């Protein structure tokens, strides 16, 4: 892999990791608090953590993904579902549609976890042994950056522009973060 491709590949993976983490951090911060205010049990709030169960469907993703294109399809389809659900939630009223919102967020987390499975697998396959630590750094930076933005910056924006103004922007960001992968022809299984 030449240096330019490697740099672009690293940036692509950074975008994928930050795109999955920003909305998840926002929802994981806001929704549990609101659920407690609505007297949901802790076990019901625990349903917002489908990521811990992703080992149940990760073999299916791996079994149906052999080529770089297969993994990209998993990433695109799951991220587009993720963005679509975030966008749909933006048009629901938090007080009257609360149960629908929680259900859609849980489904969106499953889509995000599926994207993570495919992204992790592609990162492992696309980078040589000596570059795997760089790819892991992109994962860490994207995850930490996404947590700071989703759990911090978005909370401030949420207070300023509200649920209906914020979530369409978040959905568009998730889609925009797919663009580097869409245009990246340099990712190849090593």
In which residue ranges do the predicted regions lie?
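Helix-loop boundary and gating motifs at the non-cytosolic
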Residues: 2-51
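Intracellular juxtamembrane helix-capping segments at the cytosolic ends
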Residues: 31, 113-127
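Central cavity-lining transmembrane alpha-helices of secondary-active solute carriers
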Residues: 44-65
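Glycine-rich segments within core transmembrane alpha-helices of 12-TM secondary carriers
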Residues: 51, 133-158
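Transmembrane alpha-helix termini and helix-breaking/packing motifs in multi-pass membrane transporters
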Residues: 59-63, 90, 147-168
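Cytoplasmic membrane-interface "Motif A"-like loop-to-helix N-cap segments
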Residues: 63-80
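C-terminal ends and interior cores of transmembrane alpha-helices
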Residues: 75-96
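Symmetry-related core transmembrane helices of the 12-TM Major Facilitator Superfamily/SLC fold
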Residues: 77-83, 164-183
């Amino acid at each position: 892999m030449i240096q330019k491709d490697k740099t672009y590949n690293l940036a692509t993976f950074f975008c994928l990791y930050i795109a999955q983490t920003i909305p998840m951090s926002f929802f994981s911060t806001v929704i549990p608090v609101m659920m407690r205010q609505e007297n949901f049990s802790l076990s019901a709030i625990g349903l917002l953590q489908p990521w811990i169960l992703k080992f149940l469907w990760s073999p299916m993703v791996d079994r149906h993904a052999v080529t770089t294109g297969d993994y990209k399809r998993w990433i695109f389809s799951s991220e587009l579902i993720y963005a679509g659900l975030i966008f749909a939630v933006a048009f629901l009223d938090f007080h009257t549609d609360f149960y629908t919102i929680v259900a859609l967020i849980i489904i969106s987390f499953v889509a995000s976890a599926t994207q993570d499975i495919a992204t992790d697998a592609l990162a492992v396959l696309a980078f040589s042994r000596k570059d795997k630590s760089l790819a892991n750094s992109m994962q860490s930076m994207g995850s930490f950056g996404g947590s700071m933005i989703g759990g911090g910056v978005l909370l401030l924006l949420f207070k300023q522009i509200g649920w209906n103004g914020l979530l369409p922007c978040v959905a568009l960001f998730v889609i925009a973060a797919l663009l580097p992968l869409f245009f990246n022809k340099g990712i190849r299984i090593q």
